[in-house]
C-alpha cells in the first residue's frame, strides 16, 4: 500500500515538473472586454477564427448589452479591436448572445453567425430576436447578409 502511495507521489511530482506553465499577459494583450448581462441571459459567446487568413487566430467576443469585439491578433501577443473597420458595426444595435464562425459559402474565408436577444432600442420588451450572418469579403471586411 505504501509503495503505491509513494509511486503515486513520485508520478505526481514528475507530472507537475513536466507540466506547462502559463504567464498572465491580460493587461498587455489589448483585450479589455466584459459581457454585460441582459436579464434572463446566461453569458456571452466567443469564436476563435482567422478572419484575415494571416495564419494567426483572432477572436470575436459577444458583449450582451456592451459592444461586441472582433480582436485581430497582431502576431506579438496583443490584439486590436477592428469591429468597425471590418464593417461589423450593425451588430452594435443588438443585445448579442452567441457567435459561431465557419466558411458558410466555401470561399476560403471565415464568416460569422451572431445570435441576438433583442435590439438595444427595444430592450424593455423581448420580440423575436434577429440572428445575424456576416459574409467575409476577403479584404478585412464583412457584408451583412442577414434577412431584414
Each model region followed by its residue ranges:
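Sec-dependent N-terminal signal peptides
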Residues: 4-13
Amino acid at each position: 500500500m505504501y509503495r503505491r502511495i509513494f509511486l503515486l507521489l513520485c508520478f505526481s511530482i514528475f507530472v507537475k515538473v513536466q507540466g506547462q506553465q502559463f504567464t498572465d499577459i491580460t493587461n498587455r494583450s489589448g483585450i479589455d472586454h466584459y459581457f454585460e448581462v441582459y436579464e434572463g441571459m446566461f453569458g456571452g459567446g466567443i469564436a476563435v477564427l482567422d478572419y484575415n487568413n494571416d495564419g494567426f487566430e483572432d477572436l470575436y467576443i459577444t458583449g450582451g448589452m456592451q459592444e461586441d469585439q472582433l480582436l485581430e491578433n497582431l502576431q506579438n501577443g496583443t490584439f486590436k479591436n477592428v469591429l468597425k473597420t471590418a464593417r461589423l458595426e450593425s451588430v452594435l444595435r443588438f443585445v448579442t448572445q452567441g457567435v459561431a464562425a465557419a466558411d458558410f459559402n466555401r470561399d476560403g474565408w471565415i464568416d460569422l453567425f451572431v445570435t441576438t436577444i433583442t435590439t438595444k432600442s427595444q430592450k424593455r420588451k423581448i420580440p423575436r430576436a434577429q440572428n445575424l450572418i456576416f459574409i467575409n469579403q476577403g479584404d478585412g471586411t464583412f457584408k451583412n447578409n442577414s434577412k431584414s
